[in-house]
Amino acid sequence: RARDLFISLPGLTLAIDEVSKFEMVMETARKAIYNFIRNEPSQIKIYEMEHPDILLWAVWCIQQYAKMVSREACRGKYGVLLEDIMRFLCQDKHPNLILHDNGLLYTYGTNRAVTWMNSTVNGHPVIPRTGYIVEINTLWYNALRFAGELSGEAGNNALAESLGALAEKSGKSFVNVFLNEYGYLLDYVDGNMMEWSVRPNMIFAVAFDYSPLNSSQKKGVLDIVTKELLTPKGLRSLSPKSGGYNPNYVGPQIQRDYAYHQGTAWPWLAGFYFEAYLRIYKMSGIGFIERYLIGYEDEMSSHCIGSISELFDGNPPFKGRGAISFAMNVAEILRILYLLSKYNY
């Protein structure tokens, strides 16, 4: 699946000095991206390319290459691809995204799952996230800033200025739409309908290199996530204080589908949590992260030898569930270990 691919790729390759493997996989992904952008039939079986956040995760993936290899190499290999993705999005050509005048991206998710919280029952999403979705617009702002800077470095000043202006508009709208009076971010907003449940999707606005939030706002979001979502095995998909909390991924398929994103803990989200933690606490946060990561050592010999389960129950004893090895979890743990080894914030 496309989302899993782009989130996992940096950790599974760049973080362990396998740059050539990153480039090989991205070459295949590049073909799939262009097939989608050009509305051409594709022989490449990368599923769900049409989902609204996929191209934005592809930009994030390329951004990690720029950080972990070099910006110059990134411009040379992926500069044109990056600009083509951004033009496609800015020209409002994506079939499942609408670029509104306020600079935010809107998507319809009432009747179909459109994000990583994609559990469905009888063809309907368990969590019908629709409208302005917080992580999609966080990815969007980050992509605008990163692509704008890289385009400027490549001498494409017109595109750089256009993306920068759109980022300014998007950033202001993001704060107005998502930040609530309690200091955390709404999960999604559709007109007068606001989703107040505390979910982990807000953590990306603290973790990413470019965020519309200021330092105080970032710390407020991180504090809420720490208090309500952090477990020894990852971030809960829903706060115990929110309605519908169901931390146990057990029972028949339909029962597990309802619980999938309603309180279970996901290790891959902890990778972004720790990236956010380092941005706020810098060197003083390293000890906490190192102690936390030690907790996965027992897990690697409990449910699957040498790997990490897909998800965990959200309450003690935080039992491993789902697939016995999950690429996004492994990737983000490797990426955080890399960040700790190269720490230079």
Kindly label every feature range from the protein language model.
Residues 1-6, 43-55, 122-138, 187-213, ...:
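Solvent-exposed loop and edge beta-strand segments that line ligand/cofactor-binding
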Residues 1-5, 9-114, 118, 133-137, ...:
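Aromatic-rich carbohydrate-recognition surfaces in CAZymes
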Residues 18, 74, 78, 129, ...:
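Residue-level preference for long, well-ordered alpha-helices that form the structural scaffold
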Residues 90, 97-100, 141-249, 291, ...:
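Catalytic cores of carbohydrate-active enzymes
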Residues 101-105, 109-112, 240-259:
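A mid-to-C-terminal "edge-of-domain" accessory segment
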Residues 306-309, 341-345:
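C-terminal non-catalytic interaction modules
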